């Protein structure tokens, strides 16, 4: 893993303390304790965050939703530099136990991937950003206790899944990660009104991705299958609104649902 521009090992002082304490307690930390390593074809892997200090730049995205494009680019680059520095630290810093450091150095960037961006992915994975506050904001209860909807356009079933959102220092001199949740849900219905604006604000807009949902609800709804469900319904609803000369908030919901069923929507 190459040394990133502006690399400063002090940025990973907490990681060094964590590794030192793990050694003191007799814990054996390997690569799979530092990150999720999912095998892929051709001896490659897909990695993801795992453990208290990993590939997530905790708290670094806090200002992203309200930021202008220049600030978003800066936040984007900060995430890139964090991940690059994290891997470089594990592969090179003397604070890392030899066993772990040697294991990390058995891996590297895939030489045939992302060749025009120095083998790093082209795009930041943005789980959440700015969302509409419309006619109906879906919340945790809509996933767990109020799972049926009269204006349902489809179903969701993915866990409420959020990584940590902040790291809080304590008076005792430690830190606490906050925000991680992995809560199973039973299949629930998705409300059409979650993607319609308030009627007094706009009558000809449907929002199938940045729809109205709380952080907890969006942690399940944000998956690509749900985006496709919203998009399918949005297309049919837009056509109906145009042909019927009505605002999107006043379309015939049973007629929309009938069309969706006829097109094998669930």
Region annotations inferred by a language model:
Residues 1-266:
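Flavin (FAD/FMN)-binding glycine-rich loop and adjacent Rossmann-like elements that form
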């Amino acid at each position: 893993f190459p040394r990133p521009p502006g690399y400063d090992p002090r940025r990973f002082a907490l990681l060094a303390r964590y590794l030192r304490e793990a050694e003191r307690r007799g814990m054996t930390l390997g690569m799979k304790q530092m990150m999720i390593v999912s095998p892929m074809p051709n001896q490659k892997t897909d990695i993801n965050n795992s453990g208290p200090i990993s590939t997530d730049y905790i708290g670094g995205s806090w200002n992203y939703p309200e930021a202008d494009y220049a600030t978003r680019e800066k936040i984007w680059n900060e995430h890139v530099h964090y991940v690059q520095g994290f891997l470089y630290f594990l592969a090179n810093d003397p604070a890392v136990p030899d066993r772990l450091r040697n294991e990390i150095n058995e891996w590297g960037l895939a030489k045939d991937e992302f060749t025009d961006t120095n083998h790093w992915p082209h795009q930041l994975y943005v789980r959440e950003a700015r969302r509409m506050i419309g006619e109906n904001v879906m919340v945790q209860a809509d996933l767990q206790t109020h799972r049926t909807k009269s204006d349902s356009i489809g179903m969701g079933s993915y866990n409420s899944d959020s990584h940590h959102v902040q790291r809080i220092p304590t008076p005792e001199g430690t830190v606490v990660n906050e925000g991680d949740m992995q809560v199973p849900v039973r299949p629930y219905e998705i409300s059409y009104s979650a993607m319609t604006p308030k009627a007094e604000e706009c009558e000809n807009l449907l929002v199938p991705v940045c729809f109205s949902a709380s952080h907890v609800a969006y942690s399940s709804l944000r998956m690509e299958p749900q985006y496709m469900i919203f998009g399918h319904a949005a297309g049919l609803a837009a056509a109906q609104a145009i042909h019927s000369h009505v605002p999107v908030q006043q379309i015939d919901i049973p007629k929309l649902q009938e069309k969706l069923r006829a097109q094998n929507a669930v």
